[in-house]
Amino acid sequence: MKGDAKLLEMLNVLLADELTAISQYMVHSEMCANWGYEHLHKKIEARAIQEMKHAEKLIGRIIFLEGTPRVDRLNKISIGPDVPKQLANDLKAEHVAWKAYNDAIRLADEVGDAPTRNMLEGTAREEDAHVDWLEEQQDQITQIGVELYLSNQTKE
């Protein structure tokens, strides 16, 4: 089934966001593991795996719509030197992704592609949950301090 050209391009933009997020999250996850923050390492690693699943769905949909998945595109990866900066960088990336998903949902609706819209809506809900979790972590750091927050991240 031949998909709308604008929608296919938007799906490839989303794919670049997801592929970038995978790399950024994996680096942050491994940095946390290296610092002994095992709980945070596992949470961020799980997030990277979820982003891989998002990328897989996008690739499948692009192929179904007779497009070419552009896996050679990555956005700028922002690696934080410490946990608070990592959380801030990840939150910024999630806000960008959330907006892009909502733009893509509107476009899918405009071109009458309900199955793509439905897929995107499900992923947008998961991205919204990512934003919530990151904001919660930042709130905890503000409320209890970075030292206590990090001491709570050493256990799985």
Which residues does each predicted region cover?
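Iron-associated oxidoreductase/ferritin-like identity signal
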Residues: 1-156
